[in-house]
Amino acid sequence: MTEITHRTKTRPVKVGNLTIGGNNEVVVQSMTTTKTHDVEATVAEIKRLEEAGCQVVRVACPDMRAAEAIPAIKKQISIPLVVDIHFDYKLALKAIEGGADKIRINPGNIGKRHKVEAVVKAAKEKGIPIRIGVNAGSLEKRILDKYGYPTADGMVESALHHIKILEDLDFHDIIVSMKASDVNLAIEAYEKAAKAFDYPLHLGITESGTLFAGTVKSAAGLGAILNMGIGNTVRVSLSADPVEEVKVARELLKSFGLASNAATLISCPTCGRIEIDLISIANEMEEYISKIRAPIKVAVLGCAVNGPGEAREADIGIAGARGEGLLFRKGEIVRKVPEETMVEELKKEIDKIAEEYFAKQKELEKA
């Protein structure tokens, strides 16, 4: 373990109606692919992302047209909106004025002190945080001159430089990212950052690649970082539909037991014993439970040999055999069902468990 269990020892930072850091769960983020000034397209994509489980969304802000679109976008969405700014402080001011819940900007890159002061003053007045985005591919010349090439120490030094600029202006609502496309470099940078400061860390492996390769690369890098107890919010960067980024991020958090509001599927690898159409059933169930916001573990198993034992780990499951299925709940056989109704019966049982969970949550809230 690292010296800091970062998820529980970071400074809590408010982003819209969420708190990132402190004792809060890791938050899933994504970024739109639309032109931000196209409000209709941007809002439509954000709503798709939210439906997939995205909790915070970022939009690019390359020009004043994009900045001026922020109020119209904000009115139509319900998750916090982060605005990505590079170099032009006037865009940051416009985005903040328009209702951005957070801005991503490196204070050392926007020029003279009065520009930084103006952005910090506006952020303070609105009570919104600033994310410092350190990227191995765009480190300052002085850092590269000192270290020769992108290193974890250089990335941390860059982060501390930007942090100091904000702290000197008495600004502390800061979130930091330490992104690199090299997995080992990213892991080292985040580990060193977690020891260097207590601001929340936004995790990401940048330029990770296509849906398949990027998923593997992100899972390797982000998984190693999360396993050290580091990270408060995460974005999986893929050259794909951003909805896929959210799916991968949620699945990754579920793998480490870090998503209390998500259902999980267990399904066995195929073998010669299987007597049902396991692959299509597993895919259908994965899609079905993806929108369930309850910590339910669902098993889809292909035979009665390993099924009963493996189903014990699940809240609900089915083991197929010779044209029928054994429906399990908490490892106990509930009943036999014909293969043709197996999936629908399983869905009904999942819905019952979800309803029980939500009813229990309401009781706890009243208590």
Swiss-Prot record:
Binds 1 [4Fe-4S] cluster. It catalyses: (2E)-4-hydroxy-3-methylbut-2-enyl diphosphate + oxidized [flavodoxin] + H2O + 2 H(+) = 2-C-methyl-D-erythritol 2,4-cyclic diphosphate + reduced [flavodoxin]. Its EC number is 1.17.7.3. Pathway: Isoprenoid biosynthesis; isopentenyl diphosphate biosynthesis via DXP pathway; isopentenyl diphosphate from 1-deoxy-D-xylulose 5-phosphate: step 5/6. Keywords: 4Fe-4S, Iron, Iron-sulfur, Isoprene biosynthesis, Metal-binding, Oxidoreductase. HAMAP family: IspG. Belongs to the IspG family. This is 4-hydroxy-3-methylbut-2-en-1-yl diphosphate synthase (flavodoxin). It comes from Halalkalibacterium halodurans (strain ATCC BAA-125 / DSM 18197 / FERM 7344 / JCM 9153 / C-125).
